[in-house]
A protein has these predicted regions:
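Internal alpha-helical transmembrane segments
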Residues: 1-69, 242
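Short, highly charged, low-complexity non-transmembrane loops/tails of multi-pass membrane proteins
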Residues: 275-294
């Protein structure tokens, strides 16, 4: 054990991640501080492809979570926006301020702020309407009957709405929404990745620690169980990150990582079941006494 601990931290990490036997042999050589660092490093690796992919995005499909409101956009409403322009984050110009009402649905250009809203951003509502898209002087209001509603600032750019059609209006909304809420989405996604990684490691470490009570495997402490779980997740994390860098899909990345960790832990558990610890070292052989140690 002392000889293993004398090796550098990087070398121990690489050897521990290389194979199930390496995971078992080097699992006890890491301190809690090192275990925490490894956990954070591997979690960051999983976040890298998402961050890079998301930074390249210039618009987000708002219709995916506000379908009813976005489906109301039509060419008639697009014609109302003809001649308007965005300058320094403000809507100016234009000749028409008509509204299009259809039951509880509203499409309007409201330069006078006639329509009232209630609720906090994210759950915003326009009084009297279920679905609404309202262009005001400094921001866009979009609410959906599913309870979702946002106030979206116009991007700090110069843009002229010249002969817009339905697709153009949808593209503008998608672009403006992402420009304002990109940090929020990134934070939420990174939090999801962190929680999944933490839950997975905690369950695996706890499961291995519990098996100690039945003498199925030789685990000296919960720290060692946590270290083994984290080291076993290293190769799957690198593989998932590599796939994500080529073509990012959050679900695919998480599935590759989760399935890889499960397989690696299975092989590690099998290796531990075939070995026993004697004087701090892993040996093949019997289950209970020293006579079986090779």
């Amino acid at each position: 054990m002392k000889n293993l601990q004398n090796e550098s931290f990087i070398i121990r990490c690489l050897k521990a991640a290389a194979s199930p036997s390496g995971v078992c042999r080097y699992g006890k050589t890491f301190s809690w501080l090192q275990v925490t660092f490894l956990f954070m490093f591997l979690t960051a690796c999983l976040m890298v492809p998402f961050t890079i992919s998301f930074m390249k995005m210039d618009r987000f499909n708002v219709q995916s979570f506000m379908p009813s409101a976005m489906q109301k956009v039509n060419d008639r409403f697009a014609d109302q926006l003809q001649g308007f322009q965005i300058r320094n984050g403000k809507l100016t110009g234009g000749k028409s301020s008509d509204r299009i009402e259809d039951g509880q649905n509203l499409l309007a250009v409201d330069m006078e702020h006639e329509f009232k809203t209630s609720g906090e951003n994210g759950r915003l509502k326009v009084t009297g309407y279920d679905n609404a898209i309202i262009f005001q002087s400094e921001h866009l209001i979009i609410t959906d009957q599913n309870g979702t509603g946002f106030s979206v600032r116009y991007a700090k750019m110069d843009a002229k709405l010249k002969n817009p059609n339905t697709h153009d209006v949808e593209s503008f909304i998608n672009e403006w929404w992402l420009a304002q809420y990109k940090p929020m989405i990134m934070m939420m996604a990174c939090t999801v990745i962190f929680m999944i990684q933490f839950f997975l490691i905690a369950v695996l470490a706890g499961g291995m620690w519990i098996t100690k009570l039945s003498n199925m495997i030789s685990i000296a402490s919960f720290q060692e169980a946590a270290s083994i779980a984290i080291c076993a997740s290293a190769l799957p994390a690198f593989a998932a990150a590599a796939v994500g860098m080529v073509h990012f899909d959050l679900i695919t990345v998480l599935m590759i990582h989760s399935c890889g960790v499960t397989l690696m832990i299975s092989f590690t558990f099998r290796y531990l079941a075939k070995t026993r610890r004697y004087k701090g070292e892993l040996h093949s052989g019997g289950k209970y006494d020293k006579s079986a140690v090779i």
